[in-house]
A protein has these predicted regions:
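Residue-level detector of intrinsically disordered terminal segments
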Residues: 14, 36, 49-50
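Bacterial N-terminal signal peptides that target proteins for export
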Residues: 38-48
Length: 515
């Protein structure tokens, strides 16, 4: 029996305070306690009690300690710094997704094209233009529809109409992983119904619905509907107007669309989630991250990584205290936050796909698994990126000779007839120009990109030349993309690409300087 108690006490080391007492109650019943005076059980109870007390005091229940320093008092300064970096890299996507959620839902009723209460639809009714400054490198090809879901109370039902054009719903969990990507062209009948459930959902999903089980309570849906230009907007609006959200219980009882009101907190009136997170103190950052992990639990494959982070009290429900890093805490934090791109880029380089003047982020983008440094880099540089099976976004900063693109020169982007940016059905492509500030270039033509939907002219051999310059190209007006008289870059978006493009098995168009 003593051997069993030793094992029992040892098992307590991996349990929190409340689970310890639950375990004791499970082992020793009330009747056993009543009979303890008549048997030697009292000796065993005393032994177990002492072991229990020693465990609580000795380990400090490290995961719920009032003094987190106990969890790290055996670490060297170098080990603490390494664990802090790993903790920041691990939690950063979760925190950026949370900041985006807090900002986008920080309204009582839907406002504009970017904000609505949780579980309500947000429609972008116009295409991006040179005045669009909410996000960098704005997309000029599609109109967005978004929902910030909170699945903690009930499942959410999303209704989408069948379409005959590209209309894809990217579904992100709270860690920025894409967990599903339903397309409306696949819908049979007039509508498709999708039931989103959180990790603690206990009900039943109706048989006529596609079940999307989220590992986290917070979910971000970004739905893109391709638009052929200003004259096509009424058609896009008609598609958006057929979309609905319902809470599952309401759908099953009254059938009422969800119209719940939200709340407003002035603390969340920041414009850029990344700036909000990057200026957050260490204690506040990890306190919030630890809290979020309770309702947005880490993946099972993260267990080994989290076991290490637990040594500085980073993990679900843990109590973080920056004082364990001593007088160097502030400097450590400043260096980490300031240099996060420089820290994550070398550890992600193997995933960057170079191709002539171009390069793009490849697999496992949006399906990161345990590639935490890559996940953090994308969260900062391209939050809500798609998997390569959905879209790729090659970027070019230089011409074929490796010189920076600048509007004071003339360029030709040449696409061979037998090297077309092929897509699967309903896919599309575009070449969009951005200034050094990552925004669209304001020009008299209001032309921000060249797309497969435009009326450009091919060469006699079937190839296509796109001309880029600051000065107007009167010789090729339909194929001309205006540029600033300064540095710029190009992004070649390809949605629903064929496999050879998604896997970088084709030759990207050459960008030749003409002067």
């Amino acid at each position: 029996m003593i051997y069993g108690l030793n094992n029992f006490a040892k098992s307590l080391e991996d349990m929190d305070f409340f689970h310890i007492f639950a375990a004791v109650k499970k082992i020793f019943t009330i009747n056993q306690i009543k009979n303890c005076m008549k048997t030697k059980l009292i000796h065993y109870l005393a032994t177990a009690a002492m072991m229990l007390l020693a465990t609580i005091i000795g380990t400090g229940c490290a995961s719920y300690s009032d003094n987190p320093a106990n969890a790290s008092n055996k670490l060297t300064d170098a080990e603490k710094a390494e664990l802090l970096e790993r903790a920041y890299v691990y939690a950063l996507p979760l925190m950026l997704m949370d900041a985006t959620y807090l900002h986008m839902t920080n309204v009582v009723e839907p406002v504009g094209q970017q904000q609505a209460p949780p579980n309500r639809l947000i429609h972008a009714r116009v295409l991006a233009n040179a005045n669009t400054k909410e996000v960098v490198t704005p997309n000029v090809d599609t109109n967005y529809t978004q929902v910030m879901m909170d699945l903690s109370g009930d499942a959410l039902v999303l209704r989408l109409p069948h379409t005959d054009r590209f209309c894809l719903a990217q579904i992100l969990d709270a860690w920025s992983n894409c967990i599903a990507a339903p397309v409306t062209t696949d819908i049979e009948g007039d509508y498709g119904y999708y039931c989103f459930t959180g990790p603690n959902f206990k009900g039943e999903v109706p048989a006529n619905m596609t079940h999307i089980a989220s590992p986290t309570d917070h979910v971000w849906m970004l739905l893109r509907t391709v638009c052929k230009g200003k004259d096509d907007l009424p058609n896009v609006h008609a598609i958006q107007d057929e979309m609905r959200t319902y809470m599952l219980n309401d759908y099953l009882t009254t059938g009422a669309e969800y119209t719940g009101k939200g709340t407003h907190n002035p603390d969340y009136d920041f414009k850029a989630p990344v700036d909000y997170i990057m200026t957050m103190p260490m204690d506040k950052f990890f306190a919030r991250a630890n809290e979020l992990m309770l309702t947005n639990p880490p993946a099972k494959e993260d267990a080994k990584w989290l076991a290490d982070l637990k040594r500085i009290n980073v993990g679900p429900g843990l109590k973080f205290d920056a004082s364990i890093f001593g007088s160097e805490a502030e400097q450590l934090w400043t260096n980490l936050v300031t240099n996060i791109i420089a820290i994550t880029t070398p550890r992600s380089q193997q995933f960057v796909k170079p191709n002539g003047s171009w390069q793009f982020y490849g697999e496992p983008i949006a399906e990161f698994g345990t590639e935490y440094y890559y996940r953090a880099l994308i969260a900062v540089a391209a939050l809500a990126a798609n998997p390569v099976s959905v879209a790729v976004y090659p970027r070019a900063n230089v011409d074929s000779e490796g010189k920076h693109l600048n509007g004071n020169h003339r360029y030709c982007l040449h696409i061979d007839a037998d090297n077309w940016p092929d897509t699967n059905p309903f896919g599309f492509w575009s070449v969009t120009l951005y200034g050094e500030d990552n925004f669209l270039y304001d020009n008299e033509q209001n032309r921000y990109n060249i797309t497969d939907r435009d009326n450009w002219k091919r060469n006699d051999d079937g190839s296509l030349d796109i001309y880029v310059s600051h000065e107007a190209d009167t010789e090729h007006p339909d194929n001309w993309l205006p540029a600033p008289a300064d540095d710029f870059h190009l992004i070649f978006r390809i949605y629903n690409p064929v496999a050879r493009i998604a896997h970088n098995e084709w030759t990207m168009p050459i960008i030749t300087r003409l002067d």
